[in-house]
Amino acid sequence: MKQVVIQPAARKVLRKMPVTTANRILDKINAYAADPYAQANNITALAGRPGIRLRVGDWRVIMRDGEVLDVLKVGPRGGVYD
């Protein structure tokens, strides 16, 4: 399992959202960290910039994958890509 680092901006968004939604997102992040090749992860490479996108319902998680899984942004669909 990879180590997960959540950046302050993403942590702030997670704290402000409903607990059930935040737990769903954190569960999906941890599932990806445990098995990056599972098809249920719903991961896509970002177009035009480095990083990957994790889809959790109407929420998107922008991450950088390497030795450490770096969670950069969490936001609603559409607004997270700015």
Residue ranges and their predicted role:
Residues 1-12, 16-23, 56-59, 64-82:
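Enriched for short, Lys/Arg-rich terminal
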Residues 30-54:
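A short, surface-exposed loop/turn module that caps and links secondary-structure elements
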Residues 29-30, 46-48, 62, 77-79:
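Short, intrinsically disordered/low-complexity patches at protein termini
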